[in-house]
């Protein structure tokens, strides 16, 4: 692979680009990495990305940076040199260069605000001279020798980029809502209004979603004057992310993942990653008696006086209708958001590779050791869908160094058991 095109200039893109930079400097083979980003490096951690106001704190330790866990297995005899070179782009190196390392230690190693995390990613991008294209991806097609990606700049002019490999990152659009209604805000609208202190007056508010996106929105809402704040999610309760050594070790070191059954893997992901709030957010909400949980899936939205009526469905009881003055769609990113960019031929090839119509479960089960869809002639890396097949740390910030090792590995099939397709039942 000579060229790898990455969609989205977030932590995963920076991890792969930095590792490629290090490998090349050490005289080892690595592809040229080109990154396409609509906003800015680290844009989803800034207000411009629509997923945050930039003022809330990172849900994980910043020491899990673009090189973590600094345990490269890329090239026998050269791994220590790779690890040492990657440490030049670590979170602590960023703090040392800016003269804030001692203060950060003395304050107890706090998680940084989102905007500070974005600054760290931008610092890495400058240090490695990131090959960055600012623009919006319009379409993706597969040609004779790889991928062809159409990118529109700020003035609407299209540029065609070609690459041997393609990696998709990011959560998709932050402007999506469950339904078109004046009292239902997308997460982008919510953060834009919250940043201007212009949220609509509301006595009864609801946050739809049970993951970290919803947790951050709740963390903001409790700072506003509201009588009740309801959290709507299909889970029986709002779970807290496990932060013990045993749970964290599965995220940092996915080597034991292949030995777990499918049910055990799903249990780990459900209990520790999907639909959970961070410990810090849960502690902030603990003493606020305005916050309550409503179990169910939203199946209908309708007008109601000056607000919105939301119908919740549960398997074991009749539908329930609740009314709110304001609701925020914080269900988070859409795992398959990128499929709408693929042309019909690329879609057909992808369906042939996964063995049927494109569903999340089929794509998840097709992810090989190198975090790419198995069976495609041109590599398509989907780390955000790699949790079930390869390990729970790949879709998030838990093992970015391992992620870059696998994507850039010259022997993607060397871990035979991890590369075969899973049978999902």
Describe each model-derived feature in a short phrase.
Residues 1-40, 103-425:
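Flavin (primarily FAD) cofactor-binding/catalytic cores of flavoenzymes
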Residues 39-77, 238-255:
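Conserved N-terminal glycine-rich FAD pyrophosphate-binding loop of Rossmann-like flavoproteins
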Residues 44-46, 91-94, 123, 336-337:
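Tryptophan-centered motif/residue detector
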Residues 53, 59, 78, 82, ...:
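Amphipathic alpha-helical interaction segments
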Residues 60, 64, 81, 107-110:
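Alpha-helical interaction segments
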Residues 61, 84-86, 185, 362:
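Residue-level signal for pocket-adjacent positions within structured domains
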Residues 62-75, 87-90, 117-120, 133:
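Generic hydrophobic, aliphatic-rich segments that mediate packing or membrane embedding
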Residues 70-104:
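A conserved beta-strand/loop capping segment in the N-terminal third of enzymes
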């Amino acid at each position: 692979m000579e060229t790898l095109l990455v969609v989205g200039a977030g932590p995963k893109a920076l991890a792969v680009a930095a590792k490629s930079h290090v490998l090349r400097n050490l005289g080892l083979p690595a592809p040229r990495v080109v990154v396409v980003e609509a906003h800015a490096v680290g844009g989803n951690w800034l207000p411009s990305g629509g997923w945050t106001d930039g003022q809330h704190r990172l849900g994980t330790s910043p020491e899990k940076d673009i090189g973590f866990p600094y345990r490269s297995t890329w090239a026998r005899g050269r791994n220590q040199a790779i690890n040492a070179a990657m440490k030049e782009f670590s979170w602590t190196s960023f703090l040392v260069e800016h003269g804030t390392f001692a203060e950060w230690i003395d304050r107890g190693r706090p998680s940084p605000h989102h905007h500070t995390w974005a600054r760290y990613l931008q610092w890495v991008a400058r240090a490695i001279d990131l090959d960055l294209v600012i623009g919006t991806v319009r379409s993706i097609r597969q040609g004779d020798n790889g991928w062809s990606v159409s990118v529109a700049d700020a003035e609407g002019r299209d540029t065609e980029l070609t690459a041997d490999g393609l990696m998709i990152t990011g959560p998709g659009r932050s402007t999506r809502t469950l339904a078109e209604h004046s009292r239902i805000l997308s997460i982008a609208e919510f953060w834009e209004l919250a940043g201007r202190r212009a949220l609509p007056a509301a006595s009864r508010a609801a946050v739809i979603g049970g993951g970290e996106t919803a947790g951050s929105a709740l963390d903001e809402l409790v700072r506003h004057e509201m009588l009740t704040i309801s959290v709507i999610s299909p889970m029986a309760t709002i779970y807290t992310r496990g932060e013990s050594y045993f749970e964290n070790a599965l995220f940092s070191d996915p080597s034991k993942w292949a030995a777990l059954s499918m049910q055990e893997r799903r249990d780990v992901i459900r209990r520790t990653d999907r639909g959970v709030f961070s410990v810090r957010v849960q502690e902030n909400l603990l003493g606020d008696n305005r916050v309550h949980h409503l179990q169910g899936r939203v199946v209908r939205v309708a007008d109601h006086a000056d607000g919105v009526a939301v119908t919740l469905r549960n398997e074991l009881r009749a539908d329930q209708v609740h009314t709110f003055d304001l609701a925020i769609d914080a269900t988070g990113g859409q795992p398959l958001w990128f499929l709408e960019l693929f042309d019909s031929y690329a879609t057909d090839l992808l369906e042939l590779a996964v063995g049927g119509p494109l569903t999340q479960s089929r794509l998840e089960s097709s992810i090989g050791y190198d975090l790419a869809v198995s069976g495609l002639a041109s590599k398509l890396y989907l780390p955000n869908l790699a949790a079930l097949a390869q390990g729970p740390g790949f879709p998030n910030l838990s093992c970015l160094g391992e992620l870059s090792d696998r994507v850039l590995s010259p022997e993607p099939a060397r871990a035979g058991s991890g590369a075969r397709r899973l049978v999902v039942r």
